[in-house]
Regions:
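N-terminal transmembrane-helix/juxtamembrane module of multi-pass inner/ER membrane proteins
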Residues: 1-63, 95-122
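Membrane-embedded catalytic cores of phosphoryl/pyrophosphoryl-handling enzymes
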Residues: 3, 114-234
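Alpha-helical transmembrane segments of integral membrane proteins
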Residues: 10-14, 75-83, 172-176, 197-201
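Membrane-water interface at transmembrane helix exits
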Residues: 35, 67-70, 91-99, 103, ...
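Hydrophobic alpha-helical transmembrane segments
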Residues: 54-70, 134-139, 149
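Interfacial segments of alpha-helical transmembrane regions
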Residues: 66-93
Length: 234
C-alpha cells in the first residue's frame, strides 16, 4: 500500500486538496450562493467546451475498459471495469435513495427570482442530484488510468537518473489526469446539472471505490491470469 500511495501521490494529494476545499466551501457558503458563485462565469467558448466535454464521462470509460482488456494485461482491464462499474452502481444507489433536487428544481422552489445561466442544447435534469454520476465516472476513470500508467513508469531503482526522470514524468501525468477529471467535475456545476455537494460526493466515491478495487486486485498482480494478454507482443 505504501508503494501504491508513493506512486500515485500527486493524484491522491490533489484529490484530497479538492475534497478539503469543497468541504470547507460547503460549510461556509450557503448552497445557493455557492452554486451561483461557481457557475457565473459563462462565455460562448466555455459553453461549447463544457457542453461537449461533460459527455466524455458517458462513453470514454467504455473505450478505456475495452482497450485495456484487448491490449493491456487482462487484470488491468478487469480492475478498470470493476472500479468503473462499482463506482457507478454506488452513485446510482445513493441517487435513488436520496432523490435530491437538481439546481433547476431547487432554485425554482427556494430562490425563484434567480435565473440560472443555462447552456443551449443541454438537456436539463430535475432530480437524482446527489451524488454526481458524471463526477464519479471522471474521477474513477482518470484515477484508474493514473494507477495503471504509474505502475508501468515506477522505477526499479529510485536512486538513478532514469528513476528521477520517470518520477518527473509520472508526476506530470498524474497532474494532467487530475486536471482532466476536475474539468469534468466542474462541468456539472457550470451546466447547472449539479451542486458543489454532489460533485464533492462524486469525487469521494470515484476515488474511494477505485482504491478499494485496487486493494482487492493488487494481490493478484503476480498471477499468470492477471498478466495474460489477448494480443501478445511478438
Amino acid at each position: 500500500m505504501k508503494k501504491f500511495i508513493r506512486n500515485n501521490a500527486v493524484f491522491i494529494g490533489l484529490s484530497l486538496m479538492l475534497i478539503a476545499a469543497l468541504g470547507l466551501a460547503l460549510l461556509w457558503v450557503p448552497k445557493g450562493d455557492l452554486h451561483l458563485l461557481l457557475c457565473d462565469r459563462h462565455t460562448p467558448a466555455r459553453d461549447i467546451f463544457y457542453r461537449y466535454y461533460t459527455q466524455v464521462a458517458e462513453w470514454f470509460p467504455y473505450v478505456v475498459c475495452v482497450a485495456l482488456l484487448l491490449f493491456s494485461r487482462i487484470g488491468d482491464g478487469i480492475f478498470a471495469t470493476s472500479a468503473l462499474i462499482l463506482s457507478a452502481l454506488t452513485t446510482q444507489l445513493f441517487k435513488h435513495l436520496i432523490n435530491a433536487p437538481r439546481p433547476l428544481t431547487w432554485f425554482g422552489a427556494n430562490m425563484p427570482d434567480v435565473q440560472l445561466p443555462l447552456v443551449d442544447g443541454v438537456r436539463m435534469n430535475y432530480w437524482f442530484s446527489f451524488p454526481s454520476g458524471h463526477t464519479t465516472s471522471f474521477f474513477a476513470l482518470f484515477f484508474v488510468l493514473c494507477i495503471i500508467v504509474t505502475n508501468y513508469l515506477a522505477p526499479n531503482n529510485a536512486g538513478d537518473l532514469t528513476a528521477k526522470r520517470s518520477n518527473s514524468v509520472s508526476g506530470l501525468l498524474q497532474a494532467l489526469l487530475f486536471v482532466l477529471a476536475t474539468l469534468g467535475a466542474y462541468s456539472r456545476i457550470y451546466l447547472s446539472q449539479h451542486f458543489a455537494a454532489d460533485v464533492f460526493a462524486g469525487v469521494v466515491v470515484g476515488v474511494g471505490i477505485t482504491i478499494c478495487c485496487y486493494v482487492l486486485f493488487c494481490r493478484f498482480e503476480d498471477r499468470k491470469w492477471y498478466n495474460y494478454r489477448l494480443f501478445k507482443k511478438k
